[in-house]
Amino acid sequence: MDPPGQPHRRARNHQVTASERGRAQTGPATKWGPHELAAKPRSSWGFTISAVLDRLKPYWLHAYLLTYTPLLLLADSRITALWQQWALGALTFVLLYLAALKAPKEQRMQVWICVGVATGFEIFGSLIWGVYRYRLHNVPLFVPPGHGLVYLFGLLAARTPVVMRYGRRVGQVILAGAGTWALLGLTLLPLLTGRVDLQGAMCLPVFAWFVLRSPRWPLFAAIFIATGELEIFGTSLGNWYWLPVAPWTHIPSGNPPSVIAGGYCVIDASVLLVMRAVFALRAQFPYRLGLKTIMASITSTISPRA
């Protein structure tokens, strides 16, 4: 006799039979192994993200440098003491050192030569000529390594997929953008800024020559992108400003001049001249004169006294 509250034995057997029949109809639960899970197709959105990341991977250092520039200038626009600016300079030097490790040894040498050459141009342009002036009336410590970052930005551009695929057409597109900016600086922008940017337009032929005639055109074309961002943020945030009329030449200028990248091209071309001089000196003096070499030379010429 079944206990009260429990279904009849036949009913229980019927329930069990029905549940077993259900399992038999549905079959065993499917277990996905690692290979089956890997073979499952991902969503179209996942494929899109993966493809975009793969395409952007060769440009990560360029994106990093383009991101660091406005953050650096924003921080400099907020500081009030020189030691804070020195800290930004030290940070930028460290960043330049780490970023330059991605370049071959010869290019790293060019980057550091650019730092020295650009420092000389900065002292002349800002402190002597005075065509532009920094907020604290000095040459900030982050400016020399900043030139090195711009130069490195251009050097690494030659190995990017877009340059390798499209070649000089990339330079022609950038040159067209520079020409458009120069034209606007003479026509439309004066109505908004009150400045006629003749100085920027005069830099356009210099920039065009380097882009169209130089075998290192990717360097100079990429410099326009880096310096364009640098100058726009630097003048907008008040880190420096260009005088409305340049001293000595009395040429009107925008703030910033449109194709000032032409001036940067002159700086970077000077780096190549210095490099040739360095290699010429190496040919004349093939031996490296380190401290150990000098001491060995001195001690080898000293004979003991009798």
Give the residues covered by each predicted segment.
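Charged/polar low-complexity intrinsically disordered segments
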Residues: 12-15, 25
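Aromatic-rich, lipid-facing transmembrane alpha helices and their immediate juxtamembrane interface loops
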Residues: 10, 31-32, 36-306
